Every structure is written in structure tokens, then in C-alpha cells.
Amino acid sequence: ELGWISKVHVNRPAVVRHAEQIKKWRTVKGNWQAAWLLKAVTCIDLTTLSGDDTPSNVGRLCFKAKHPIREDLLKALDMHDKGITVAAVCVYPARVTDAVNALKAVACNIPVASVAAGFPSGQTPLEIKLAEIKLAVQYGAREIDIVISRTLVLTGQWEDLYEEIRQCREACGEAHMKTILATGELGCLANVYKASMIAMMAGSDFIKTSTGKEVENATFPVGVVMMRAIKDFYWQTGNKVGFKPAGGIRTANDAITWLMLVKEELGVEWLTPELFRLGASSLLEDIEKQIFYHVTGSCALQHDLAMA
């Protein structure tokens, strides 16, 4: 229904002011901080998307995905028996089989997510995008992170964008689909809102801010606009769509701020791995350092924490 987006206007100054207020929020402390950080861990898509990825470093990542926080630290927080893991492991299609096998080896049912559809640029013929998605699913990916064609957004080809995402959704089959908008390359916040709505209308299970490869990745103004779109879509259809900020989320405070923003904009029901993810490669390390400090009262040295 293109009528939903034809008259969209985003008050950029108001959005930016709201984002500035978010940055000034006082962070939680003590046990509350530890609880929020453990919640963040369960929402992380632990990611490696490098040209030099190998079966060995993917295997280490998968082990860390199952054991994100040191066992003795979890025992000190009385959380050792809660089965805390990250939400998913995210890799390139060529590394999906490595990740699936590594997780099986440690008896872990964490889903493997694969980027696809011409990631990160989206400058790939649709036939190739669909074939890549199907291969990733065939290899064992249970979640697919596609990336949209920014060209279709910037030239206002909304029906073509809808059709491309719809075909990607069809190619995913039973796998969940997250649609990456690459918001830093969409030109304006109105386009972010419109692309969000089109992606949801086409069947996306999640909408995601960024590939992590753009100059500008997950920002609070973009997050506010995308979450308002999710809320509007829910009011119109009754369907809940997930939200995933990704790129540049490196610190424990970043994670807590995103969690608090989701709670304010969408409500506590979105604070689950089924509806909220954090795309990150280095975030988990900082979270574990903060939990180490909370439990021991001292800063973690390099040898204190396992490498991912």
C-alpha cells in the first residue's frame, strides 16, 4: 500500500533533538547495569564479516557465542544456570557450513545468520541475489540478512524495491529474513522511514540499520525513525517486526542506550531476541569487561578473558 508512504514527512530537527536527549540519559549502575548487560548479550548477533575469515576463526567465534561470559562471573551473579548465549552467529555465505559444524561440535542450537543479496553494496543482479540466499539456506543458515538496493530508494522506485524484497523473502523459505537498509546511504530520514515500511510490507521479519561497511552506521536519529515505522506498521497490521541496529556499536554503554531506546519507543515486549538484535563484532568483549569489573572490582587484563 504505497499510500502509507506517499505523504511521509520527517521532522528532522525534532528527531535530532530527541536523539541528543538520548545521549544524556543517565546509565544504570550496579546490579541493574549487570542485568541490562546480560540482556544485551542475549540479543547480540556475534559477527565476523572479514575477507580473511577462516574455519578456525569462525570456530572460535562459535565457541564464544555459546560461552559469551566467563562461567565464574555468571556464578557470582547467580546466572550460571540460565543458559545465556548470544542470539546468533553471523557470517558470509561461504562460511555458513563452518559455523553450522562448529556449533554442532559444541552441542549448541544457536542459529547461524548469513548476509546475502549482494552484501554489502547490493549492486548485484536480482537473480544472483536470490541464488545466494537459497545457497545460504541450503548450507544451513536459519536467518538471512539481505541488503537492499539503495539505487531503488534514491530514485523513488518503491514498487520495484517492494518486489525485490518480496522475492528475497520468498527465497528465504523457512529462514527468518532481516532487511538491511544501509541508512547512511539513503539520503534523508524520510527515505529511511519509507524504506522501513516497504521492507516490512514485503515480509521482513526484522529491519536493520546498516551493513557496518558504510561511513555512517547505526545512529540514534535513524533508530528513532525506524522504530516509529515499526510502531506505525504494528498499529496498521497487528504484526510485530524486529529491529536491529548494527555498525559502530562497540561499548557496553552503547548497548544499554539502545536497549533503553527500544524500551521507550516500542515497549518491553520488544526486548527479546525474537524482536531485537544488536549487530556487533567487538561489543561482547567490552560487555564482558564491564561484568568482570562489576564482579571483581578490578579491571580485566588481556589474559583474563577468552578471545572470540
Language-model features: locations:
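A short, histidine- and acid-enriched strand-loop-helix "catalytic/donor-clamping" loop
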Residues: 49
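Alpha/beta enzyme core
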Residues: 30-41, 52-84, 93-244, 250-281, ...
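Charged, compositionally biased N-terminal leader segments and the immediate start
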Residues: 1-41
